[in-house]
Amino acid sequence: MKKQTIFLAFLALAALVSCSKEPKVENVIYLIGDGMGLGSISSLVLSEDGATGFEMGDPVIGFSETCSANNYVTDSPAGGTALATGTRTKNGYLGVDPDGNQLKSIMKDAQEMGMKSAIVVNTVLTEATPASFYGGVLSRSQGYDLAKQFTTSGVDVAIGSGLSVFINRPDSVDLTETLINDGYDVYLDWRSVVNTTSDKFVGILPMGDVHRRNKSTNTTAGAADGAEVCLAAKLAASAQEENIKEGYLSEPDQYLCKATAKAIETLER
């Protein structure tokens, strides 16, 4: 397999930064966990007898001050912006500095260096933390704006949820068509994501498939809006039995493993 330079921004329910002793870093995997401080990680390590991948201090461990530019307690947009850009901003601000100026993320820097990039999340692709790597808004509630900004993110692979802001929009623009016109393959079900040989794709899946908290056996309830309800119902009716039979994803607890593996496989081509 031909080795290529890779940058992966995986936003998931985990937290780990891997450092290499090699003089040249070729691959970077940046995992950001929601609420996974030392207390949570230590409890996990103890309960699993250390076999977690979160071995403390191996090879190094660091600390950072997390307060935002205007509050001792940060929020997701400001926290994500700090992680993505290295700049402290106001609570609520996402991808912009305290004066509202667009910031450049480390993913953008990596892309400019010729690196490939991917975002994998167990939430919507326009959630505050992943959006901090490609977007710039004054409020995390600007999901429609973030979806539009995502289409120009330059990311090679993205897998997550949140179809509604891409297709059920006030401007009546179908952003999945925009992505397709820009050379992406767009998939709305796991079967297609698992089987694709595309080098550039976006998977926008039902929320129940990517996060157990949102898993529901009732496909007419619990989704963000009608668009995702309809999609979830159609997918569940047509694919669930066959997917389980053939070993495809059937539960959210399998999502991160399979989505991460697929992204790495794609970027390594």
Protein language model regions, located:
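Positively charged n-region of N-terminal signal peptides that target proteins for export
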Residues: M1-T5
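N-terminal catalytic scaffold of extracellular/periplasmic and nuclease hydrolases
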Residues: K21-R169, V173-N195, D199-K200, T217-A224, ...
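Membrane-embedded translocation segments of transport machinery
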Residues: A232-S238, G247, A261-T266
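C-terminal motif of bacterial Sec signal peptides marking the signal peptidase cleavage site
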Residues: A15-S18
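Membrane-embedded hairpin module used as a gating/binding unit in multi-pass transport
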Residues: G203, M207-R213
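Hard-cation-handling environments
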Residues: E242-N243, E268-R269
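Sec-dependent N-terminal signal peptides
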Residues: I6-L11
